[in-house]
Amino acid sequence: LLQRLNRIKQVGLSSVVYPGAQHTRFQHSLGAFYLMSEAITQLASKGNFIFDSEAEAVQAAILLHDIGHGPFSHVLEDTIVKGVSHEEISLMLMERMNREMNGQLSLAIQIFKDEYPKRFLHQLVSGQLDMDRLDYLRRDSFYTGVSEGNIGSARIIKMLDVADDHLVVESKGIYSIENFLTARRLMYWQVYLHKTSVAYERML
């Protein structure tokens, strides 16, 4: 299931506008997995206790977070199966894998569904500052050549901490977060919602 992502482009039909954007969901998933490993190490170094089982589970959750993507990435998301998001399909596939693996993904699924007491673990997978976004913004920026999306993901991860089981950012990291939010907005304007890409998506 994971290897299937090798055949799905990360930015769908944006390669029509940006020919260099040939990177895949598989590459992105590996990148997000790496950033998650860095984030777990960083949070643990600040005295936040994370069991090895929790670290493995949250890494599994981020590695599998995109397995529900179909052909052309987001383009056909609401066309093939109406009203069902790729996150829901990812969850369905994870639950199927969990049955085949005798429950070894149970904790990862709990985290993915935000049903685990340590809320910050889910926020690392799916939140305003999750490892998914930190990876795809830099990756998409690099392969499209749109430099505005090039964020300092390593700096942001160093600024992360936990308070009351929620993910927080140290005050000295506010400037990096402002840059991150600006970069995300600019990438939507210049890449994800580019008029030519959107026109091709409508035709498809």
PLM regions: where:
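Sequence-structural signature of the catalytic-core scaffold of metal-dependent phosphohydrolases
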Residues: 1-60, 68-203
